[in-house]
Design a protein with these regions (language model features):
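Short alpha-helical linear motifs
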Residues: 153-159, 184-185, 221-229, 249-252
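Hydrophobic alpha-helical bundle signature of multipass membrane enzymes
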Residues: 39-213, 244
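Interfacial helix-loop-helix junctions of multi-pass membrane proteins
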Residues: 205-236
Length: 257
């Protein structure tokens, strides 16, 4: 799978202040080292305790702390703009948006059935189910360590008026839903290139729903998309991933006959 600047721009493009996006995601990559890098307990992105949980990734690769810029600083103009966008999106969300977002609290690759087709269910595709479970668990591990590294409070923590439903205790940046859904989508879209646009669109929707219920800032969502590309790129270096990918491709082809 090839990743280029054009592809990244397509994934990141949503109606959001471009100046904020440039300041948060582009300039810090050149000018600002990762936060907390001097903290030895946090500088190992995937610890020995996490190694046994990895399926297609090697320890420390990819590291969110090395790929992503820091999130906006507390009390900064960037943070204020990010929070304003959360409030705007949250208050504009419909009841259907809210229901969809809460319905995706737990999700798997089979949430993409609407984009793929009626045959795309776990009971029909055991190899596909097992493969994507590993893919998602690896993505979750990388993302969770990124959250613990950057320590960004969630929007509803900073502004309690945004609190609704059962609230997560984890940190905000990068978004796990955005990262995991885009990882699933990028891999699935390579398996089913004819469904590429619909698959990617659904992943973007899963991520954006998290802003609509004030679980994440827009910059959390964009960071997840960047991290997802890095994770999938690293997957492609794994022989185990490539072997399982080929087996899943054959299973999907057979299921469509």
């Amino acid at each position: 799978m090839k990743f280029n600047r054009t592809a990244i721009a397509r994934l990141l493009s949503l109606s959001f202040n471009r100046s904020l996006w440039l300041a948060v995601f582009v300039l810090p990559l050149v000018a600002i080292p990762p936060l907390r890098a001097a903290d030895d307990t946090m500088s190992q992105p995937i610890s020995a305790a996490k190694d046994s949980q990895l399926h297609y990734l090697k320890s420390g690769k990819p590291a969110a702390s090395e790929i992503l810029p820091p999130p906006p600083l507390p009390n900064s103009a960037e943070q204020s703009a990010d929070m304003d966008e959360v409030r705007t999106v949250y208050h504009a969300a419909s009841s259907n948006d809210m229901a969809a977002a809460f319905g995706e609290k737990k999700f798997s690759v089979f949430n993409f059935a609407g984009a793929v087709g009626g045959y795309f269910v776990a009971t029909n595709l055991p190899k596909t189910a097992a493969f994507f479970e590993k893919v998602q668990l690896d993505a979750e591990t990388v993302t969770d360590l990124g959250k613990d590294y950057f320590h960004r409070p969630r929007p509803f923590t900073t502004d309690p008026s945004l609190a609704n439903g059962k609230l997560e205790k984890s940190f905000s940046y990068p978004s796990g839903h955005s990262t995991e859904s885009m990882v699933l989508a990028l891999v699935l879209a390579e398996l089913l290139p004819e469904k590429h646009d619909a698959i990617i669109a659904h992943a973007r929707q899963i991520g954006w729903h998290r802003v609509q219920i004030a679980r994440h800032y827009p910059t959390d969502i964009y960071a997840g998309r960047v991290l997802a590309q890095a994770i999938v790129k690293q997957f492609k270096k794994s022989d185990a991933f490539e072997n399982d990918f080929d087996a899943v491709k054959a299973e999907l082809a057979a299921a469509q006959k």
